[in-house]
Amino acid sequence: TGFYRTPGLSWDPANGKGSPFYYFACGAAVSEVEVCAYTGMHRLLRVDILHDVGDSLIESIDRGQIEGGFVQGMGWLTCEELRWSDAGKLLTDAPSTYKIPTVGEVPEAFRVALHRQRKLPGAQVIFGSKAVGEPPLMLALSVREALRAAVAAFAEGTAVALAAPATPEAIFSAIAALRAAPGEANAVP
């Protein structure tokens, strides 16, 4: 067997300088949500994503990877809850108890734009392409933050503590806490 070491990586922790990554894949996302104050249920209405793909090899595949990574992250932050018994047994260990996002959670308005950068300064990547499968997972933070902003709208000017994943129960609890103590700031996780 062999190994691969990405060339040119370095990091000096004493100085906080170096090149710890070969390149960066940047992106931005904006999410619009709707929250029911009585149940904590929410709907993702719209997502707009811009993701840096370098020089896209196959645009349709890149878009699918970006959408898939985003939806996976959305599940992690909104419904994929791990629950444990007092004895340490995982209680959410089956499809009936561990919820993942379905097509019903994906918004109809799901827009993905590709930012293309033909030449990557200093990087010798395959045909100029960049990673598009894993980085979009973090773009789903826009969903959780949109949910937090929606909950905060119930008590304007108040910071909101919202658990992750932001399940309907967590959203309902956050709204109930705002109603119980109006005007008091909650710690933001």
Predicted ranges, named:
Residues 1-189:
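C-terminal catalytic domains of large/alpha subunits in multi-subunit enzymes
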